[in-house]
Amino acid sequence: MAHENVWFSHPRNFGKGSRQCRHCSSHSGLIRKYGLDLCRQCFREKAADIGFNKYR
């Protein structure tokens, strides 16, 4: 088996490796609530466009 066949060949069906940000494909700091699937950095950029308001 060549390196290309081995790399990322393990199935990622659950856990942090199975989910990624829909905007930047990052695996860290993911906000999954309400089906957002955005990392926290992208959420801060896109929150106003989505319709979230900051009251404080």
Curated annotation (Swiss-Prot):
One MF term in the entry's GO annotations: structural constituent of ribosome
GO cellular component: cytosolic small ribosomal subunit; yeast-form cell wall
Alphabetical keyword list: Cytoplasm, Ribonucleoprotein, Ribosomal protein, Zinc
Keyword Zinc: yes
Cofactor(s) required, per the database record: Zn(2+)
Annotated binding of Zn(2+), by residue: C21, C24, C39, C42
GO biological process, one term: cytoplasmic translation
Localization terms from the record: Cytoplasm
NCBIfam families: PRK05766.1
Recorded family membership: Belongs to the universal ribosomal protein uS14 family.
Subunit structure: Component of the small ribosomal subunit. Mature ribosomes consist of a small (40S) and a large (60S) subunit. The 40S subunit contains about 32 different proteins and 1 molecule of RNA (18S). The 60S subunit contains 45 different proteins and 3 molecules of RNA (25S, 5.8S and 5S).
Function field: Component of the ribosome, a large ribonucleoprotein complex responsible for the synthesis of proteins in the cell. The small ribosomal subunit (SSU) binds messenger RNAs (mRNAs) and translates the encoded message by selecting cognate aminoacyl-transfer RNA (tRNA) molecules. The large subunit (LSU) contains the ribosomal catalytic site termed the peptidyl transferase center (PTC), which catalyzes the formation of peptide bonds, thereby polymerizing the amino acids delivered by tRNAs into a polypeptide chain.
Name of the protein in question: Small ribosomal subunit protein uS14
